[in-house]
Amino acid sequence: LIGQIQDSNSFWLSQQITKLGGTMQRISILDDHQPSIVTALRHAIERGAKTVITTGGLGPTPDDLTVPSLAELMGVGTHIDDAVVQDHLRRRGITIDEHTDNLKRMATIPDGATAYPSPAGWAPLVRAVIDGCTFFAMPGPPREMEAVFARFLEDYFSAGEGAHRALTHRVYVDMWESEVAPMLQQVMAAVPGTYCKGYIALGNQRFLPIDVVTRGADEAQAQSELNRALDMLEQLVGEAGRDFQR
């Protein structure tokens, strides 16, 4: 929020979760301020979110506030997780006497939560269920976050209630955004669950890029719907006497 760090985690997570069948409803960027964090997490529960993912705030410095915020929301204390400590000792080749205060802080989780040692860093994935909402607190560095997601969360979203598959294909049309917009609306109406988006900022002087996203119960159905949407859009553009590139 002070312009020092660019958020790439939410962009990456949105891509992965959509592919695996999840539906993103909201992305928030919060200051390192515990009351603000607790309020945002509580509002997510009140809105009926089934899953909330946080990234960052699991390190050893005073501004790492995710664990104490979760503990406050849960109304519990915290403890040092032995499995995370043992993972630190094994991977670092150290004894318990050499386990530093900073490492202990990164091994600390709310009472009643579950920790999953990270395959790429020292802060674990922390899972907590609060009033029917599952919270996953992930480390902030992108390399660590992506490794934790691949190890622990891909299967969670793939097996989720109402899970589906989503596919995306980018095409290019020889039209202005205002010209092709009615055609995109026709495609989305004809192929339910389809989303079409033109990117005028990415276009050159002639061709406008358009992403077509479709969903299905499985990859085969998503591909079938994608083919339908692409074929229809190509036909509409062709009928207007314009070029269409897949």
Show where each model-derived region lies:
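Short glycine-rich or small-residue beta-strand-to-loop segments that form or flank ligand, phosphate
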Residues: L1, T51-G57, F135-M138, V213-R215
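N-terminal beta1-alpha1 ligand-phosphate binding loop
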Residues: L1-S8
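Short beta->alpha linker loops
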Residues: S8, I29-D32, A83, K104, ...
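N-terminal small/polar loop signature for handling phosphorylated ligands or for N-terminal nucleophile
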Residues: S8-H79
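Proline/glycine-rich low-complexity loops and linkers
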Residues: S36, D64-E161
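Conserved short beta-strand edge segments in small beta-sheet-based binding/regulatory domains
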Residues: L233-R246
